[in-house]
Design a protein with these regions (language model features):
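Intrinsic-disorder-associated, low-complexity terminal segments enriched in Asp/Asn/His/Tyr and depleted
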Residues: 448-451
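Active-site loop-to-helix "anion-binding N-cap" substructures in soluble metabolic enzymes
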Residues: 2-347, 353-435, 463-466
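Hydrophobic-composition signal
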Residues: 439-442, 454-457
C-alpha cells in the first residue's frame, strides 16, 4: 500500500516545515491524550459538536504502546498478525490514517467492510478500524462466536449521535398521531422509516420493527424507491443532506422535504407542511462534509481550468449542485481509477482518502476541496498504538491468557429487527437500465450484494506492510 500519511502532513505543518493549515493544533498530538481528558469527539471536523452524555470512553492505553515509535508499532502489529494468522481479520475504512490502513486485510466503505466480516466465518476476531456504528453492523452480520473489536471505544460518529432512539421514537409517535396508521387505497402506509448506514444499531432495529429499511450512500435512490412503493412518505435519518440530495435527484420538490428538529413540536413544521411532505429530513449532518463550500469549488475551477469536481452526497445541496459529479467513497475511487492520465480532480470528502488517492494515482492531479487539513475526528481516534494493543491481547503468553479487548456486541432484542432492516436493503435492487440515467445509481451495486456486488479491496500481508 502506498503510504500517504496525513499524520506526517499535520506534523510538518505544525512545525512550520511546510506551508498549510489545520483546523486544530491538537491534531499533532496522540489520540490517547484526549481519551484521558474531557469527553468529546476529539480534534478535527467534529470538534465543535456536542457529544452525548454517556458516550463510550476509552481507558488509558498502556505506556508501552503510548511510548512506542511508528516503526516499533508497525513491527509489533506485523508480528502479532503473523502469530494469529487466519484467526483474526483486520478491516480498515477508507477514512483511516495510513499508518493503520497499511495493516488492513480489507479496505472499503462501511458496508463493504461489514460484508467482508461476513466473508471470514472462520476468523475468531474481527478488528474493525473504523467507528462504532460500523463495528455494530459487523457484529450484526458476523457469526455469533466471532468477536468484533473496536481498537478505541471513543471512535464514535457525531452524525450517528444526532439521531438517538428516544428522539426518533418521540418523532414517530407525533407522526402517527398526525397521520394515523391506516394504509391508503394503494396499500401504502402513512410513513416509512429509512436510516442511513451511519446510525446506531438501535435505529436500524427501529426501522426493522416499523417496516423500514437501511440505505448506503450508493444505493439511497434504490432504497427510497422501495420505500415510496410501500409508504406515502419517508422519514429519513440521520443525515439531512444525503436524504435531500437523493430525493431531489428523484424529482421530489424541496417544499415537500421539511426538516425535523427533535427539539421542536412537530419538528418545527406545521401539520399542513408535514401532511404535504414526501420526505421528512432529520436535522443531522456529517461534520466532515459540511466543511465543503461552493466558494471552494469556484476557487478550484479558477485555479485549475478543466478540473473535475466530485463530492460525496453527504455534502450540502448547493455543493452537490455545483460539483460535476457526486457519489460514495467507492464511486470516487473508481472514477479516479478510470480517468485518462493527466486528469485533475478536486474531491469533496475526507482528507485521508483524498491524500491516499493522490499518492496512488501520480498520473493525475488530485487535491481536497478544503485547503485546511481537517480529518474526521472519530476516525482519527484509531491509532496504530491501539491496534497493536488489541492484537497482542489476543495472543496468550506464558504469564497471561488471551484476552478480547473492546468487544462490540449488539443485544439480541435489537439485533433481530436490525438484521431485518439490513436484509430488506440487500433485497432491494435498482430497476433495470436505471444505472445509466444519473450519477448515483452508476455505482449503486458497489456496496450492495447480489450478482453485481463489488467486494472491498482485499490486501495481502506482504503488500499491506509495504
Amino acid at each position: 500500500m502506498t503510504i500517504a500519511s496525513v499524520d506526517r502532513t499535520i506534523q510538518l505543518i505544525s512545525t512550520g516545515a511546510i506551508a498549510g493549515s489545520t483546523c486544530s493544533p491538537d491534531l499533532a498530538k496522540a489520540p490517547w491524550e484526549f481519551d484521558s481528558g474531557t469527553p468529546g469527539y476529539g480534534p478535527g471536523s467534529s470538534m465543535g459538536d456536542v457529544i452525548p452524555a454517556g458516550s463510550p470512553r476509552q481507558g488509558q492505553l498502556p505506556e508501552s504502546y503510548r511510548s512506542a515509535g511508528t516503526e516499533e508499532l508497525r513491527e509489533r502489529i506485523r508480528a502479532a498478525k503473523e502469530t494469529l494468522g487466519d484467526r483474526v481479520v483486520i478491516l480498515g475504512h477508507f477514512y483511516q490514517r495510513d499508518e493503520v490502513l497499511q495493516h488492513a486485510d480489507f479496505v472499503g466503505d462501511s458496508f463493504q467492510l461489514a460484508q467482508a466480516a461476513r466473508s471470514r466465518p472462520a476468523a475468531e476476531a474481527i478488528i474493525f478500524c473504523g467507528v462504532h456504528f460500523m463495528a455494530e453492523t459487523a457484529d450484526l452480520l458476523s457469526g455469533p462466536e466471532q468477536a468484533v473489536i473496536l481498537p478505541n471505544l471513543a471512535a464514535g460518529c457525531s452524525m450517528a449521535d444526532m439521531a438517538d432512539i428516544d428522539s426518533v421514537t418521540e418523532c414517530w409517535e407525533q407522526l402517527e398521531e398526525l397521520y394515523g396508521t391506516e394504509p391508503d387505497a394503494d396499500g401504502r402506509v402513512p410513513v416509512i422509516p429509512v436510516t442511513y448506514m451511519n446510525s446506531s444499531a438501535a435505529l436500524k432495529g427501529f426501522c426493522g420493527e416499523h417496516g423500514g429499511i437501511v440505505c448506503t450512500s450508493s444505493n439511497a435512490e434504490t432504497v427510497l424507491e422501495w420505500a415510496f412503493e410501500r409508504g406515502q412518505r419517508v422519514l429519513f435519518f440521520p443525515d439531512q443532506h444525503l436524504g435531500r440530495n437523493t430525493a431531489k435527484a428523484m424529482g421530489v420538490p424541496l417544499e415537500q422535504m421539511p426538516m425535523w428538529n427533535p427539539r421542536k413540536p412537530l419538528g418545527g413544521s406545521t401539520a399542513e407542511e408535514l401532511d404535504a411532505a414526501r420526505v421528512i429530513l432529520w436535522h443531522g449532518f456529517c461534520s466532515v462534509h459540511k466543511r465543503f463550500t461552493v466558494d471552494q469549488i469556484t476557487t478550484a475551477r479558477a485555479e485549475h481550468p478543466g478540473v473535475r469536481v466530485i463530492v460525496h452526497p453527504e455534502c450540502p445541496m448547493p455543493v452537490v449542485d455545483a460539483a460535476d459529479e457526486y457519489g460514495s467513497t467507492d464511486y470516487i475511487r473508481k472514477a479516479i481509477a478510470a480517468a485518462p492520465a493527466g486528469s485533475t480532480f478536486a474531491i469533496g470528502t475526507e482528507i485521508n482518502m483524498v491524500q491516499r488517492l493522490a499518492a496512488q494515482h501520480p498520473e493525475h492531479t488530485i487535491f481536497c476541496l478544503d485547503p485546511v487539513v481537517c480529518p474526521c475526528s472519530t476516525m482519527y481516534r484509531i491509532h496504530s498504538g491501539y491496534l497493536a494493543w488489541v492484537l497482542e491481547a489476543l495472543i496468550a503468553g506464558d504469564d497471561k491468557p488471551a484476552e478480547v479487548l473492546n468487544r462490540i456486541t449488539v443485544s439480541e432484542d435489537v439485533a433481530g429487527y436490525a438484521r431485518i432492516a439490513l436484509e430488506r436493503m440487500l433485497a432491494a435492487k435498482p430497476p433495470a437500465g436505471a444505472a445509466a440515467a444519473v450519477v448515483e445509481p452508476v455505482e449503486a451495486s458497489t456496496t450492495d450484494t447480489g450478482d453485481a456486488a463489488a467486494p472491498p479491496v482485499e490486501t495481502s500481508t506482504t503488500h499491506a506492510g509495504a
